[in-house]
């Protein structure tokens, strides 16, 4: 095998890397978001049509009217993607459906196009825009419909078996054995009934028929004995039907008819029971005779029914070779038998099954019937009697040692529900609700004038779609911290959600890594915490097939020549189980044959050394095992998996920096992940760049047309980071389709660039890097190396209140002119203003609550005219820690035609941008799970420096490496230093990257010392440190956990309503909880006064804290504390239990507790006239202090008539 190590590879148009890969790429990575886009496209092309054809035609109860589906069409969307974002609207297109209403009595046909609501569209990036925010529909991992068998051991240690037929929707059918070897069935988790009762109910009533179908077995005999004929007046079938009905509907009068209808509806009605395509495929596959007969001994001679030729003799062992001969005959229905159920059974159609007799492996003398389901068509979506009989046969055969049990955690038994299918299921719910309405309207309205439009009520359909996008567990606000987070979110697989698991019920087995995950689901990338193993990520090469099973690609090995071909087969997990797969790093000769006689290979869960003539397939690439984020970790093979998990997860939390750098030591995944993430601006057609500036790129296509591309500038992302694109093409450059025209956030030259390449030394310094803390040079602050831009959005809306409309204005009560200096004439902050915490952004006043006016007040108001009502200041101010520069202001009003929610007259959005430099307390990390908090930022001159005088940037604690076992960071450090010296970028792909030799070879080439260490000098004294230190370049990222977001202090603030104690948490401007253990600490020190003030003034002594506040303001001594509110709550609780409890002081005089009624001052009535007079005088006195009003009575009498008119 030729070594490719050290060759140069081009990534995109602008970046070359020296790659250490030894294995050539046979297959390019697929489009990484196709799991989203392909699934949605399927839904638009086929899924919607399938839905309409399932539900329609709808017939009325008499069968006179029929509403049929003709066609559907999605019209042009109302808004573009950018407009939908700006207007807080949905990016959606109106769905129009053509329906035909046929009146069978008159033969009249009416066709009409009906509007079916706006249907959300997927953007090119694989997201949806709902209410202006980008959302992602996460794919769900669920158990596939099908028939499953499992072993179980009872409390006495006796082995038994169980079986479950799981539909896509409908009733479950379970079978189990008990300690007495009797077989039972349960329908939909109800009480169990003997297995033969269900067989009789299906129409095979007599014992003889049952033994004829299933053959003789001990379990079956025990079950038949248990199932006695109790009522001689009923036939066995009718009795079976009644027994089933009794279990399903206990307490209701049982008749054979009602039971027949019930069973028909439960299993054989396509509207109520649906196996789906995948269920039918799985059932046929499991009950297929070809796999079940393998390695058994025939108990009958098999004859070709057409020619009478003997195919296989009795007593033959059915090996692979024999089965190859037999397979075509089995497929053509060999040994099919037709059984006719009795007239009173559930299904009266004849049942065809295939029965082949074999000898039992447990008792070689005894014959056993193996029953196949006769291969129903793929179109049969319900379960059929033949399926039930064949699955019972499989279940009974298990006791004879024939067949095998299933592993429910195997990816052959778990499938993906992607966007398209999830939407389809939701749409079905809406259509089913609509169907009920249509039926009712058909019977009520006049058939002569009826049109499809009058029948249809689209509300349930619209509501179900809205509910799905708005509040489903799988519709998530997109993680947009950086492009890698975006990409990973779209490729996420969740086992939670409707129809899935719940966190509490999910055991260890479901969460564990399974051998079938290889190449399908990443064994590393999953969250830490309660969701571990329930939320996974799709592996880099994996695809989802039409049944929803994950497939992974393998290179086919030509068995005859022993050559590994370039032909790629995508295999699902259950098909892969039949093959032996060699690893991607197996050495090959020039002609593609294996270089060694024995290779490492996988056969199901085993890793074996096998001879090359047994190998069927070979892995495509070493990185097909892992997900995209994991594949971005260089030297992954040298890291412990727990740390690699943290490394993969933390890359998603990297904050986009002002001028990011792609890593010098990469893995070669940087370009592809950035290209497919949706954050880069990609060229749609070949052409030449005709114009380029910061906000627009124009490309002249080869056919002469002009394409315009808008470059996004400083848009707020979902997570409050700056989403900014910058062009990387130049004027006159020739560009091809799919080339990156502009970098998105966290990208450089088309590659993912989450952090910076910094000079790192592994050394301790004065204890400042204790417990993984990071010491940093001030250069990184000064040169804006780790500076990021954050944009926060604040909004204020003017609503209609009961007391009148709120008003956005500059005139705000009790606010000085200084505070209004940056507001415009409307009272809205100007763009570019620098604001601090507490500054005004939008001036707004709300009418003050005036209590209901009495008759006299209304009269006086009418006489003297409406005076200016009192208003409250409800302006929007900058919250704590939110200061910055006003980046943009958006104003939405009804007059301008903007859609606002009811009761809102005006909406103002203010965007404030912050430039955050790196800070002590910020969290940083490498790519190997090596995270820490910046503990000290030191002057550049105090940092240790290299012999050439270069000060290092960061000091990490060497003790963070050995116990964590992430040695990859040390290798990255050395290779990074060599790359820096040589001025090159390198790629070291996962599991196929630079070996130890490669690293040391590159170190030598760069002219570094043989151990890659160096002498460091103390920046303060200039003396060299004792030992040589590992210094090199490491890629470090700044994470979204920034100290500015967490810093919080409270003086006084809001209190809880009931307990009157301070609230908690930064969002509520709350306090720090002083809990039980903290109280013990103060008690232990005997700090009585400190303890007293913490439990009273600082907590819930309502009166005391107000008096204390006043005392501090006036500079008086602090008064004695009162009774805490929580004590009053306790007293009231005891009083409510009927205990007369009072509080006495030392002198045994009762202490009055604050009563709730004291607060309700509003309830005290005031004489209406005096109240009105007080309101009036304040204004009157200012204007007419000199004038005296004489003879008010005369005025009142004169104005009486006017008053009456006004009141009317």
From Swiss-Prot:
Concerning SUPFAM superfamilies, the annotation shows: beta and beta-prime subunits of DNA dependent RNA-polymerase (SSF64484)
CDD domains, from UniProt? RNA_pol_B_RPB2 (cd00653)
One Pfam match: RNA_pol_Rpb2_6
Q: Which GO terms describe its biological process?
A: DNA-templated transcription
Keywords from the named record: DNA-directed RNA polymerase, Nucleotidyltransferase, Transcription, Transferase
A GO molecular function annotation here is: DNA binding
Q: Which PROSITE patterns match?
A: RNA_POL_BETA (PS01166)
Instruction: Determine the domain of life of the protein's source.
Output: Bacteria
Catalyzed reactions per annotation: RNA(n) + a ribonucleoside 5'-triphosphate = RNA(n+1) + diphosphate
**What protein family is recorded?**
Belongs to the RNA polymerase beta chain family.
Summarize the protein's role. DNA-dependent RNA polymerase catalyzes the transcription of DNA into RNA using the four ribonucleoside triphosphates as substrates.
Query: How is this protein named in the record?
Result: DNA-directed RNA polymerase subunit beta
Please name the gene that encodes this protein.
Answer: rpoB
């Amino acid at each position: 095998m030729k070594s490719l190590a050290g060759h140069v590879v081009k990534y995109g148009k602008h970046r070359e890397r020296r790659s250490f890969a030894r294995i050539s790429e046979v297959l390019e990575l697929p489009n990484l978001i196709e799991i989203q886009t392909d699934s949605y496209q399927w839904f638009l092309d086929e899924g919607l049509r399938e839905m309409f054809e399932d539900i329609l035609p709808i017939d009325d109860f008499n069968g006179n009217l029929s509403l049929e589906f003709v066609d559907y069409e999605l019209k042009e969307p109302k808004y573009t993607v950018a407009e939908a974002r700006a207007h807080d609207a949905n990016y959606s297109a109106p769905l129009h459906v053509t329906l035909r209403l046929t009146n069978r009595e008159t033969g009249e046909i009416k066709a009409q196009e009906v509007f079916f609501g706006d249907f959300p569209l997927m953007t090119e990036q694989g997201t949806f825009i709902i209410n202006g925010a980008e959302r992602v529909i996460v794919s769900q991992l669920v158990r596939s419909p099908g028939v499953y068998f499992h072993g179980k051991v009872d409390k006495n240690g006796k082995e038994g078996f169980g079986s479950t037929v799981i539909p896509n929707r409908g009733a479950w059918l379970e079978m189990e054995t008990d300690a007495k070897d009797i077989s039972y069935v349960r329908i939909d988790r109800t009480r169990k009934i003997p297995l033969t009762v269900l067989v009789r109910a299906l129409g095979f009533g007599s014992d003889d028929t049952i033994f004829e179908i299933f053959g003789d077995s001990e379990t079956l005999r025990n079950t038949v004995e248990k199932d006695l004929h109790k009522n001689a007046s009923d036939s066995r079938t009718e009795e079976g039907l009644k027994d089933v009905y009794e279990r399903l509907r206990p307490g209701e009068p049982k008749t054979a008819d009602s039971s027949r209808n019930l069973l028909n509806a439960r299993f054989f009605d396509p509207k109520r029971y649906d196996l789906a395509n995948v269920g039918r495929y799985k059932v046929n596959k499991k009950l297929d005779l070809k796999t079940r007969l393998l390695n058994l001994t025939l108990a009958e001679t098999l004859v070709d029914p057409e020619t009478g030729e003997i195919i296989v003799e009795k007593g033959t062992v059915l090996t692979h070779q024999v089965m190859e001969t037999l397979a075509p005959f089995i497929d053509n229905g060999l040994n099919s038998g037709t059984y006719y159920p009795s007239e009173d059974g559930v299904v009266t159609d004849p049942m065809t099954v295939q029965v082949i007799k074999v000898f039992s492996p447990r008792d070689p003398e005894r014959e056993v019937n193996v029953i196949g389901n006769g291969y129903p068509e793929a179109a049969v979506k319900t379960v059929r009697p033949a399926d039930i009989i064949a699955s019972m046969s499989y279940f009974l055969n298990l006791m004879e040692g024939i067949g095998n049990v299933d592993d429910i955690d195997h990816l052959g038994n778990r499938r993906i529900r992607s966007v398209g299918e999830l939407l389809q299921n939701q749409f079905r719910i809406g259509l089913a609700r609509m169907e009920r309405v249509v039926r009712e309207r058909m019977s009520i309205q006049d058939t002569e004038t009826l049109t499809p439009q009058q029948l249809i009520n689209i509300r349930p359909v619209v509501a179900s779609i809205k509910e799905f996008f708005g509040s489903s567990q799988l519709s998530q606000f997109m993680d947009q911290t950086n492009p890698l987070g975006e990409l990973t979110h779209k490729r996420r697989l969740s086992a939670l959600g409707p129809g899935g698991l719940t966190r509490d019920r999910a055991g260890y087995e479901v969460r564990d890594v399974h051998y079938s995950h290889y190449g399908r689901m990443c064994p590393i990338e999953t969250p830490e915490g309660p969701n571990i193993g329930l939320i996974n990520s799709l592996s880099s090469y994996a695809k989802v097939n039409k049944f929803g099973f994950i497939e992974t690609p393998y290179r086919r090995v030509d068995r005859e020549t022993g050559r590994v071909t370039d032909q790629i087969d995508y295999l699902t997990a259950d098909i892969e189980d039949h093959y032996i797969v060699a690893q991607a790093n197996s050495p090959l000769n020039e002609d593609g044959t294996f270089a060694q006689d024995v290779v490492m290979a996988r056969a199901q869960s085993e890793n074996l050394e096998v001879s090359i003539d047994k190998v069927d397939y070979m892995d495509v690439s070493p990185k097909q095992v892992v997900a995209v984020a994991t594949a971005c970790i260089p030297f992954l093979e040298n890291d412990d998996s727990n740390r690699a998990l943290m490394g993969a997860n933390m890359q998603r939390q990297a904050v986009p920096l002002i001028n990011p750098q792609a890593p010098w030591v990469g893995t070669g995944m940087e370009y592809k992940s950035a290209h497919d993430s949706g954050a880069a601006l990609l060229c749609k057609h070949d052409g030449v760049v005709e114009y380029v500036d910061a906000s627009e790129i124009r490309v002249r296509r080869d056919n002469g047309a002009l394409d315009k591309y808008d470059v996004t500038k400083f848009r707020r992302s979902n997570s409050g980071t700056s989403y900014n694109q910058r062009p990387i093409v130049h004027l006159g450059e020739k560009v091809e389709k799919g080339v990156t025209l502009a970098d998105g956030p966290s990208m450089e030259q088309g590659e993912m660039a989450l952090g910076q390449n910094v000079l790192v030394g592994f050394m301790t310094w004065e204890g400042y890097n204790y417990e993984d803390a990071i010491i940093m040079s001030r250069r990184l602050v000064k040169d804006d190396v780790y500076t990021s831009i954050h944009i926060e959005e604040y909004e204020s809306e003017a609503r209609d209140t009961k007391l009148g409309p709120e008003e956005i204005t500059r005139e705000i009560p009790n606010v000085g002119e200084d505070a209004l200096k940056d507001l415009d004439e409307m009272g809205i902050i100007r763009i570019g203003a620098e604001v601090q915490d507490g500054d005004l952004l939008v001036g707004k006043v709300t009418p003050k609550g005036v209590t209901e006016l009495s008759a006299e007040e209304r009269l006086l108001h009418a006489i003297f005219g409406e005076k200016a009502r009192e208003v409250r200041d409800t302006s929007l101010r900058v919250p704590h820690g939110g200061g910055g520069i006003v980046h943009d202001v958006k104003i939405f009003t009804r007059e301008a035609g903007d859609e606002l929610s009811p009761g809102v007259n005006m909406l103002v959005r203010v965007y404030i941008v912050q430039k955050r430099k790196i800070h002590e307390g910020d969290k940083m990390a490498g790519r190997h799970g090596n995270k820490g908090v910046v503990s000290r930022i030191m002057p550049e001159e105090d940092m240790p420096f290299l012999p050439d005088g270069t000060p290092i940037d960061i000091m990490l604690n060497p003790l963070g490496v050995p116990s964590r076992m992430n040695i990859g960071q040390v290798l990255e450090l050395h290779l990074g230093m060599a790359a820096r010296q040589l001025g090159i970028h390198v790629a070291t792909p996962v599991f196929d990257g630079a070996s130890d030799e490669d690293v040391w070879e590159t170190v030598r080439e760069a002219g570094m010392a043989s151990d890659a260490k160096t002498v460091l000098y103390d920046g303060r004294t200039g003396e060299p440190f004792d030992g040589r230190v590992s210094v090199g370049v490491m890629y470090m990222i700044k994470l979204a956990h920034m100290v500015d977001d967490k810093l919080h202090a409270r003086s006084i603030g809001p209190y809880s309503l009931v307990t009157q104690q301070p609230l908690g948490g930064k969002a509520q401007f709350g306090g720090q909880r002083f809990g039980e253990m903290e109280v013990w600490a103060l008690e232990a020190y005997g700090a009585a006064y400190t303890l007293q003030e913490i439990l009273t003034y600082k907590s819930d002594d309502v009166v005391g804290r107000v008096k204390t506040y006043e005392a501090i303001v006036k500079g008086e001594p602090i008064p004695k504390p009162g009774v805490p509110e929580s004590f009053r709550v306790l007293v009231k609780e005891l009083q409510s239990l009927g205990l007369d409890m009072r509080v006495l002081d030392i002198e045994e005089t009762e202490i009055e507790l604050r009563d709730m009624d004291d607060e309700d001052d509003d309830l005290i009535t005031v004489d209406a006239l005096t109240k009105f007079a007080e309101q009036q005088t304040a204004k009157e006195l200012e204007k007419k202090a000199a004038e005296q009003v004489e003879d008010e009575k005369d005025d009142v009498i004169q104005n009486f008539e006017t008053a009456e008119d006004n009141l009317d």
